Amino acid sequence: VIMINYLMGFLSNFFNPAVSFVAITDHKSVINKLSRIYRFAKIINSSVDKYSYIGINTWVVDTHIGAFCSIASEVYIGLATHTIDNLSTSPIFTERKNATGHSWVECDHAINRLQTEIGNDVWIGFRAMICGGVTIGNGAIIAAGAVVTKDVPPYAIVGGVPARIIRFRYSQDIICLLYTSPSPRDGATS
């Protein structure tokens, strides 16, 4: 079944000039034709809006990516979690098909897959990691190597492990103005 999903994703994006021939997408992912997905990127159960690009060998899982986003190479977005309220965190106890190749259950137990949201005009640096369920606000910048475990406000610049706010790109007055003015993201023209 997994192979069929990837094959369907490959075929659905075969004629999409936005997706590299050697990128991997599944049939649930929606890639805007005005975006770019570079080689060896893996896009699973996600959407990528117009004028955004995803760098080489980047993984995107269970994520919506807004317009005008710049995502560097080797970034991981929507990192999976393990159950932590069971006796063990091993997927042997929750999934029939898992990374170990072994299972002690006859049916899969529900695992809460968290949707990750990346706003518009977000820049994510090389080898950053974004945990599942995080929301990154419009205009935010994620520094290279950062590990984002919590929501990031609009126009914040974050970095570190775990990521923390370094500063904001603009004053709060300008950020408010940006939210009340029409922008190219909304289809406005000058």
Language-model segments: what does each one mean?
Residues F15-F21, H27, R36-V134:
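Flexible, glycine/small-residue-enriched loop-and-beta-strand segment within the central core
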Residues I2-N5, G9-N13:
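Short hydrophobic helices that act as membrane-entry/anchoring signals
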Residues G133-T135, G139-D151:
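Basic (Lys/Arg-enriched) interaction patch that binds polyanionic ligands
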Residues Y179-A188:
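Conserved small/polar residues in nucleotide/adenosyl-binding loops
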Residues P153-Y155:
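Conserved catalytic segment of ABC-fold P-loop ATPases
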Residues I166-C176:
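Solvent-exposed, charged amphipathic helical/linker segments at domain boundaries
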